[in-house]
Amino acid sequence: MKLMKLNRSNILIIIVSIFALWNLSWFLITSIKYHKFVEVVPKNEFGVHLLKKDDGYIYSIKKPGYLSFTGNLAISNDDDQESLIIWPLITGGYEYGFSIQKDRETYEFYVDDDDNMKPIDENDPAAIEKMEEYKLELEELLSKAKEMWQL
């Protein structure tokens, strides 16, 4: 009976230790990964990492939620019709998404490693048309993001 109690307490200690280690790992990984980003986009008076620069671009950061490793960086123009979302990957590198809001419609695209847009819905002719129309805006947002966050 005493051996059974000892085993239960050992199991509980192991479980608590694993959970504590997971929390510590999450905290260190996300803090280190996002440190260089939040340094250049500090929290505003509302506690949000948001910065509007004089050039009309708005930069924001969403750090990963508790025990999640997925956060994002975002940049949009002043009229907020075009936005670039950047997902820093834990393993290194980034994934990009581009969003256009025009005439009450939203068009979303993946951005590949060569900075080319690919519509999420490849069968949507309007999205393909917008993709061609907004190439310069994507290039400008990518350039601003790379300059701001040293990507």
Q: Which functions belong to the PLM regions below?
A:
Residues 3-6, 19-94:
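N-terminal export/targeting and maturation segments
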Residues 56-151:
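Extracytoplasmic electrostatic interaction patches
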